[in-house]
Amino acid sequence: MNVIGLDPGLNHTGWGILSIEKDIKLIGNGVIKTNNKETPGQRLNKIHKELINILNSYQINSASMEEVFINKNPRSSISLCYARGVLLLTLNAMNIQVFEYSSNYVKKSITGNGHAKKEQVHFMVEKILNVEFKGTYDISDAIAVALCHAYSKNNF
């Protein structure tokens, strides 16, 4: 079974795909980046098209992402919701079931601490999968939610 974890954002949407059989293997990951000089509609369309390409490249059985939370900055929350909406629409159109988890639940399932910092989540994702990531936390956050899904569904 392959599950995609998604970390939505209008600027950067992280994604990670896990193969879950007797063990868990990371089989793909990346970031969908948009140009902030483009209109929101153009940026959302890019997220939509790139997600379709990713989904068509792997046999995805389910998807997971964090539930919406209200950020201190209302504009950030609105942009996040735009990206989430496009992801949910795209996944639904491709008949991929989406599972959502609270941020605290994801952190607790990966680190043992529901209030862990991004650095701790990143470190544990690397440790669990025996891989090393460079760059932003978008990828490790996406993989963390996919791992959380695997753990919560006892899929391995």
Swiss-Prot record:
Cofactor info, note text: Binds 2 Mg(2+) ion per subunit.
Originating gene: ruvC
Give the annotated active site: D7, E66, D138
Q: Which PROSITE patterns match?
A: RUVC
- What is said about its interaction partners and assembly? Homodimer which binds Holliday junction (HJ) DNA. The HJ becomes 2-fold symmetrical on binding to RuvC with unstacked arms; it has a different conformation from HJ DNA in complex with RuvA. In the full resolvosome a probable DNA-RuvA(4)-RuvB(12)-RuvC(2) complex forms which resolves the HJ.
Which SUPFAM superfamilies does the record associate with it?
Ribonuclease H-like
Report which superkingdom the organism of origin falls in: Bacteria
What is the protein's given name?
Crossover junction endodeoxyribonuclease RuvC
Keywords, ordered alphabetically: Cytoplasm, DNA damage, DNA recombination, DNA repair, DNA-binding, Endonuclease, Hydrolase, Magnesium, Metal-binding, Nuclease
| Family membership | Belongs to the RuvC family.
- Which InterPro entries is this protein grouped with? RNaseH-like_sf, RNaseH_sf, X-over_junc_endoDNase_Mg_BS, X-over_junc_endoDNase_RuvC
